[in-house]
Amino acid sequence: MSQFFYIHPDNPQARLINQAVEIVRKGGVIVYPTDSGYALGCKIEDKGAMERICRIRQLPDGHNFTLMCRDLSELSTYAFVDNVAFRLMKNNTPGNYTFILKGTKEVPRRLLQEKRKTIGMRVPSNPIAQALLETLGEPMLSTSLMLPGSDFTESDPEEIKDRLEKVVDLIIHGGFLGQQPTTVIDLTEDTPVVLREGVGDRTFTAADPAC
């Protein structure tokens, strides 16, 4: 049976955030709010927790997970970021974007896309997600909470509790959220490519390349 925390969506209670992070550190799988609906999260290094997430969502081998980072400095430890990519991300984070980048040696090989060695990276603006990442002190392995048979991210924490309370360790109630996914941008080449349109503005901005 999972725990169920009511955390204030704008001013997260430090006591509950600390308890949530301790669950993650001990190998737990949590449901938590992001800018684009609820997500499943666990420690990067915990293969067992990752496999539990795969079973919950019935994901195939090689599913592309995302690393949730607290800021660009942390993101740059886990992905190769050139000047063009840095300027674009600086102008659009934190926010509703997932960036595809080449992973560094800090990323476990099992998490990298097999052929291109890429990984999805996000810097969320949701206050609860940010508080979790700040307290954890490292990125969190994450994937949108889309249950089998659904094309939408789960948005109602009470419904999530009814369906998942026996298979996850913690569900964080952070309010009712939207169901649109993030906008996915491939930054592995010289020109950014939008791979998926989502809640992030399609006309994302980059700084003047001459800067």
Where are these regions (language model features)?
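Active-site-adjacent structural elements in enzyme catalytic cores
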Residues: 1-211
